């Protein structure tokens, strides 16, 4: 199957997923996301992410309920983003005055459901929670010049949120 996460599409993030059957109720999903764009006023939401995932389907593969275990890793360059809230222990409001550049790696578990739309089309929803370690450099904004410092952080919370449009071969 090939898939696209409509939530990533809404954030201008290019994404593509591939899923293949491993056994009667098991599949392997691999998704990749990339956002190379810089917007006006030096606003950045640049990142890439790779997320491999094993899924166990309770009825049959590619239909109904599934449970998942996933890994995630990537790099980011975020900054000059106004109006973001505090979310799950992360103070996203700091992205208004600073730029963060770093990498992350983590793991999580998820639950999802796939609705059959037709012979070759599914709509799939999934939510995942877990943890991710990140190491980053913090820069001044809005011109993002001077290095303020380096730090690391362990994030606990959402590690996957997807509404996928799926094409089945």
Question: Where do the protein language model's features map onto the residues?
Answer:
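Membrane-embedded beta-strand positions of outer-membrane beta-barrel proteins
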Residues: 4, 18, 30-32, 52, ...
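Flexible, solvent-exposed loop segments that connect beta-strands
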Residues: 33-47, 75-103, 135-154
């Amino acid at each position: 199957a090939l898939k696209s996460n409509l939530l990533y599409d809404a954030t201008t993030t290019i994404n593509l997923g591939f899923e293949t059957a491993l056994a009667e109720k098991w599949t392997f999903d691999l998704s990749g996301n990339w956002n190379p764009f810089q917007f006006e006023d030096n606003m950045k939401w640049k990142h890439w992410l790779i997320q491999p995932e094993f899924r166990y389907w309770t009825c049959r593969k590619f239909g109904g309920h599934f449970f998942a275990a996933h890994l995630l890793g990537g790099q980011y360059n975020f900054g000059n983003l106004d109006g973001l809230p505090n979310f799950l222990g992360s103070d996203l409001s700091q992205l208004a005055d600073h730029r963060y550049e770093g990498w992350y790696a983590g793991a999580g578990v998820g639950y999802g459901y796939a609705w059959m739309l037709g012979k070759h089309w599914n709509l799939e929803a999934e939510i995942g929670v877990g943890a991710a370690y990140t190491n980053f450099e913090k820069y001044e904004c809005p011109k993002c010049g001077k290095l303020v410092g380096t730090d690391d952080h362990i994030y606990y919370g959402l590690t996957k949120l997807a509404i996928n449009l799926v094409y089945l071969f």
